């Protein structure tokens, strides 16, 4: 059968990684197996990706590495958009406005203005009270549950095997003697997985309110020192609008709370009053645990017994959709560098 590759995890990072293996490194899909406890369509607090608001925003840190992951993802998502069949796949472009109660720094601003389509700095005279800086641009929006399912279906149809399996130790991901490489894309699970148990991994809890508001087709975000308010329309979702949110470090609670729902609705309708031009129809309230990591994402190759290779790719926190393609590209490059795979990188 030849050497086999296992991708451990089927959240957005695992799916991006599998896509990169095929389309950036030229690996044969039939030699790739995705192994995961949770698969697209599942709902669990420990399966973060379906709960995401789902857009490219300025939530990520301003270090050079993460900014590069963001840039790569933003500029290359059109490839996935095209291969998956256009906007119906759960990925589309929409206008976005972002405000900060503080200046986000030259490093972030100078990076963003290089590549964001339709990038404009909003004049101070047009900023809401208390806002220090604002920009507008055209972004990518995800319908996260739909996009995950379509990505998995796309890969499966190209002969990638997808297996539901709960593992307690990363060594179990080496399914056969032919499994030579494992990509560890376990997200929050990296905190407990035997052989990994990364003490730097922690949850950043969020709560969102999903409403029916087809008249809202723009993103609007406001970033404070200790809060985040965001309004994110889901493409091809029959008018779903995600309202958020919270960034609660080290909070493992998967429950939702009415007082947080009230706070989210208050903040988002103040930020974009026209949400209330139509009666507010709440579809669902959900909480998710962003897979954060002290020091940022771990993208690292680890040579194991008998020359087997584990490549870690996790810790994307709340920016997996917008930085994950770049992260996965970098992780796959580690395979190319270590195994000298014939590749297009």
UniProtKB/Swiss-Prot annotation:
Record InterPro entries: DAO (IPR023209), FAD-dep_OxRdtase (IPR006076)
GO biological process: D-amino acid catabolic process; nitrogen utilization
Position of sequence motif Microbody targeting signal: 343-345
Molecular function as annotated in GO: D-amino-acid oxidase activity; FAD binding
Residue sites binding (R)-lactate per the record: 230, 290
Protein name as annotated: D-amino-acid oxidase
Main localization of the protein described in the UniProt heading: other
Subcellular location: Peroxisome matrix
Catalytic reactions of this protein: a D-alpha-amino acid + O2 + H2O = a 2-oxocarboxylate + H2O2 + NH4(+); D-methionine + O2 + H2O = 4-methylsulfanyl-2-oxobutanoate + H2O2 + NH4(+)
Record family assignment: Belongs to the DAMOX/DASOX family.
Gene3D superfamilies, sorted: D-Amino Acid Oxidase, subunit A, domain 2, NAD(P)-binding Rossmann-like Domain
Phenotype upon gene inactivation: No growth when D-alanine is used as a carbon source, and decreases growth when D-alanine is used as a nitrogen source.
EC number per UniProt: 1.4.3.3
PANTHER family documented for this protein: D-AMINO ACID OXIDASE, D-ASPARTATE OXIDASE
Residues holding FAD: 10, 13, 49, 53, 55, 290, 317, 320-322
Record's function text: Catalyzes the oxidative deamination of D-amino acids with broad substrate specificity. Enables the organism to utilize D-amino acids as a source of nutrients. Enables the organism to utilize D-alanine as a nitrogen source, although it is not strictly required for this process. Also enables utilization of D-alanine as a carbon source.
Binding site for anthranilate: 230, 290
One GO CC term on file: peroxisomal matrix
Biophysicochemical property: pH dependence: Optimum pH is 8.4.
Influence of temperature on activity: Optimum temperature is 50 degrees Celsius.
Keywords per UniProt: FAD, Flavoprotein, Oxidoreductase, Peroxisome
Cofactor (UniProt): FAD
């Amino acid at each position: 059968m030849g050497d086999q590759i296992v991708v451990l995890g089927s959240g957005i990072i695992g799916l991006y990684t599998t896509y990169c293996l095929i389309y950036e490194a030229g690996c044969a899909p039939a030699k790739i197996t995705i192994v995961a406890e949770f698969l697209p369509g599942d709902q669990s607090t420990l399966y973060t990706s379906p709960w995401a608001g789902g857009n490219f925003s300025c939530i990520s840190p301003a270090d050079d590495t993460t900014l590069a992951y963001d840039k790569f993802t933003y500029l290359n998502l059109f490839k996935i958009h095209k291969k998956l069949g256009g906007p119906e796949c759960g990925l589309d472009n929409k206008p976005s406005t972002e405000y900060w109660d503080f200046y986000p720094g030259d490093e972030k601003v100078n990076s963003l203005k290089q590549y964001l389509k339709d990038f404009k700095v909003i004049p101070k005279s047009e900023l809401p009270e208390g806002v220090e800086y604002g920009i507008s641009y055209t972004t990518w929006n995800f319908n996260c549950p739909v996009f995950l399912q379509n990505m998995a279906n796309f890969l499966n149809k190209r002969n990638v095997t997808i297996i539901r399996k709960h593992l307690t130790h990363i060594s179990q991901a080496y399914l056969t003697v032919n499994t030579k490489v494992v990509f560890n894309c376990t997200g929050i699970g990296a905190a407990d997985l035997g052989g990994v148990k990364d003490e730097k991994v922690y949850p950043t809890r969020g709560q969102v309110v999903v409403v029916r508001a087809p008249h809202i087709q723009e993103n609007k975000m406001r970033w404070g020192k200790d809060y985040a308010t965001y309004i994110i329309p889901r493409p091809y979702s029959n008018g779903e609008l995600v309202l958020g949110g919270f960034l609660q470090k080290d909070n493992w609670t998967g429950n939702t709370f009415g007082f947080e729902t009230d706070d989210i609705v208050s903040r988002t309708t103040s930020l974009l009053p026209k949400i209330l031009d139509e009666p507010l129809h709440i579809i669902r309230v959900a909480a998710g645990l962003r897979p954060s990591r002290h020091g940022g994402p771990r993208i690292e190759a680890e040579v194991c017994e008998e020359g087997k290779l584990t490549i870690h790719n996790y810790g994307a926190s709340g920016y997996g959709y917008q930085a994950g393609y770049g992260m996965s590209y970098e992780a796959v490059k580690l395979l190319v560098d270590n195994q000298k795979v014939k590749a297009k990188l």
